Amino acid sequence: MLGLEKPLSSDISSSSTDTSAISPISVSSMPLSPDKEKKKIKFIRYNPDIPQIVTSFKGYQKLMYQGYRYNIYQVVPEKNFKSWRCVCAKKMPDDGQWCKCRAETTSDNSNACTKNTHNHPPKHRVAEIEFIKSQLINAAFENPDHDAGDLINQACMYLSEGVSFDNKESLKKSLVSARNKEGKPRKPKSKTSTNPLKRMKIEIEEEDENVFKMQRMDNDITGFLPLLNNSISMVKVESPFSTTPTIQIPPPNPPQIHQPQEHSNLLQPAALNGFNNSWMGGIEDPIAMFWANAMLNPSGLDVLSTIAALSKHQLHSQGPTQAATAPAAPLSSNLSVSSFTPQMPKEASMAIPPTQILNLKDLKPLPPLAAIQTSPVIQAASLLRPIPMKNDMGTQTVEEIKVSRCLTSGCGCRVIRICCCDEGRCRRAAAC
């Protein structure tokens, strides 16, 4: 049987685990370990009279001098020369003019001097903040294990009175991002493609198995072919032409070339639909014959051939013509039965009288204007000028109504007076 041993008694006052040693007050007063002790970072205060070189987050160098900021413009190592250009050279300032001021330094960024003058006031606050930010970036790279927030708090102690960072949280994120990207190669910027088909790419999710799979569309137009083939294969088409008889469409008739007709046929009675028009045999005048043929067959009208036929007929009107003995030839053989065939009335068989030409010598001169005005016809027409009648509109007084009563007793009619004066002119006053 095992026995329990009594623990040895010890003096608490002489023990190293004294209650005062583990009290909260003593813990807070204990010095921190060297690895947890806050490291002091030394920054340089901003001095506008000393040219300072800063490095931005993107790695570009800037010159801060007398409250103005300059971008690197030209570097000539052979001549120990650097040229700087004001940041307002491309950025429009408040006055609306570009700054043409330049600064020059040696290769070690000393002995700064300016050329020309600035057209805008200096901005010391912006220059100081950029100068301290540049030191923050270097401190974050040199001390990667140091807290970024503590670095910002230490940098704020070196700012001038009234100057502070706009957003400390955003600055902290920038420092952390710069630390993570250190030592990593930059990703090359991909050039934006100008092909509009690139925006139309369709990606099919693998989870949905019911959706038919389709190849991804390339930049070529051939990417549309899989979609077209799949959509056509999903449709079942039954041909209805297996039982339907084929219909043969006859080819169209070729256009027939109009053959020139003889001049004499235009002045002969034409055969309409294979029948001779016996009533046109009595027409002897060539002009009447021409109009009769034109009414029966308008498509066979040829102006040039008609003029030539009429002129030839006038030259040989005295002797017998060959056209009188020639058989009647149809003007057009293309005239169908369904075409419009007007019937020629009997009055059309009469010869149309020739047009008379007026001779200027036969015209008589007009009489003079004085003789026309004194003509009895003109004077009689002026006397018959209508006179406007003015009716009684019911504005007469009681006495005027009594005067205008009818002379016959018991009659209810009234006498209507008519004024023969013109508007605005009294004839009686003119006669007086």
From Swiss-Prot:
Coiled coil: none annotated. Its main location: nucleus. GO terms for cellular component: nucleus. Gene3D superfamilies: 2.20.25.240. Residues 1-33, 174-195 are annotated as: Disordered. Pfam families: FLYWCH. The keyword Metal-binding applies. Residues 30-188 bind DNA. GO terms for molecular function: RNA polymerase II cis-regulatory region sequence-specific DNA binding; zinc ion binding. InterPro entries: Znf_FLYWCH. It is found in: Nucleus. Keywords: Developmental protein, DNA-binding, Metal-binding, Nucleus, Transcription, Transcription regulation, Zinc, Zinc-finger. Putative transcription factor. Binds to specific sequence motif 5'-[TC][AGT]TGCC[GA][AT]-3' in regulatory elements of target genes such as myosin myo-2. May modulate gene expression, perhaps acting in opposition to transcription factor pha-4. Involved in morphogenesis, perhaps especially in formation of the pharynx. Plays roles in molting, feeding and morphology. This is FLYWCH-type zinc finger-containing protein peb-1. It comes from Caenorhabditis briggsae.
